[in-house]
């Protein structure tokens, strides 16, 4: 992978000049000039997904110049490097191969000269056998009862991905009840334990090292709770499994290492739902549906790795994002799924994007002088319309939005879905084209009112429009289409990281707070006044000690 400062490229300089020409051009102007704009600026994937990027402040020239930037930064070479197992995560000296986890073609993928696929397939087979025993009821708890509830204990990538997918695919779930515990706040585990029965609950402890503070604190609390009912420590093995590589610690916890599901250091946490970390997904929707999820992602992997950049959906979305972030000064992107099952999708890619590309040091070790990762946020529609869309429509910030919706709903109640989709279509139209003063005044006339007498309120009803959006319409949210959609965003993030010359697959920003917390924890054990920190931190700790009694 080449380490190129994008702002020093000829393409970036050309884009800067082009931006000066484009900054006052409106989306309405672009549609007025080209009646065929939709067909030129949209594409379908596998007859499962339509991506419409026509309501953006771009022209064919814009895209051509952005493609030049991708070429000059050697995006094609970087894609080959990742897919071939090169150690592109250089700060940790690791390959980045979540694509191997869903490599349904089973073609060899080498790391240090060794094909990883036999081990990947062996873990998948183990997940299949284990999940079938749990789902069928063949696996019995310590009193001979079948499992009814599964509690996944993890944090970050060991929680966000499985939770998002199991929620998104609830229409495919079986009889097992899924629960997720992540926060070290005891409230989280306490509230989940109130809902489950020790005789019929399986706990999945998801920690590669089996040392993650939050996860192991929750796991030990779950174990203590379980043993209060079960008594004998030998019963732990019937009710706990591990997603880990630390066999010694897993065994000491009381888990049978035969029920330890491993993954590898080339699997990053926020890209790990495709691995053993996805065992909760398998238990929720069954192994065959999990394979469909992998297959959808694999299909997008093939599209990303083989399709020319001009037609490559992850690349197009990535380039458009860079255009707004670095030239228009957009600081955030909203992800707005019009599907209630997808209510954790934005939160999942909040981690996926911000932990990946929230970096201010480039691959050469230099502080950057341009924008890297955007702030990602969002909520399901139509809820967001009654919360924060006001700012998107009439605020002073530019907020590029991705609208996502299925054409076919899993719950065809009355005309609910038509009403939902009418809002989905209306919002992108409203954001793009707005409403002029003339239209507002005409609306008053149509109501028999004189606009002149209402002049004071007219400006507040004007919408400038020119707010950019992408629309992603899925045929239906299935395991396959969801897998493809997740991979679309993963590769968008990778593409942006390549071009912005940052290391996308490490996360050193997580470490400092953890180190300081480990230093502070012993100071909270007694009632002594603290003076070892700055005055603010000392003051906070000492007030905490005074109030806790």
Curated annotation (Swiss-Prot):
Catalytic activity: alpha-D-glucose 6-phosphate = beta-D-fructose 6-phosphate
Involved pathway(s): Carbohydrate biosynthesis; gluconeogenesis; Carbohydrate degradation; glycolysis; D-glyceraldehyde 3-phosphate and glycerone phosphate from D-glucose: step 2/4
SUPFAM superfamilies reported in the protein's UniProt record: SIS domain
GO molecular function, one term: glucose-6-phosphate isomerase activity
Alphabetized UniProt keyword annotations: Acetylation, Cytoplasm, Gluconeogenesis, Glycolysis, Isomerase
PROSITE patterns hit by this protein: P_GLUCOSE_ISOMERASE_1, P_GLUCOSE_ISOMERASE_2, P_GLUCOSE_ISOMERASE_3
Localization annotation: Cytoplasm
N6-acetyllysine: residues carrying this PTM: 80, 228, 234
List of catalytic residues: 355 (proton donor), 386, 514
One cellular component (GO) term of this entry: cytosol
Database matches in InterPro entries: G6P_Isomerase (IPR001672), G6P_Isomerase_C (IPR023096), Phosphoglucose_isomerase_CS (IPR018189), SIS_dom_sf (IPR046348), SIS_PGI_1 (IPR035476), SIS_PGI_2 (IPR035482)
Enzyme Commission designation: 5.3.1.9
GO biological process: gluconeogenesis; glucose 6-phosphate metabolic process; glycolytic process
Domain of life from the UniProt record: Bacteria
Pfam families from the UniProt entry: PGI (PF00342)
Family, similarity comment: Belongs to the GPI family.
Record function comment: Catalyzes the reversible isomerization of glucose-6-phosphate to fructose-6-phosphate.
Protein name: Glucose-6-phosphate isomerase
Organism: Escherichia coli O17:K52:H18 (strain UMN026 / ExPEC)
Lineage of origin: Bacteria, Pseudomonadati, Pseudomonadota, Gammaproteobacteria, Enterobacterales
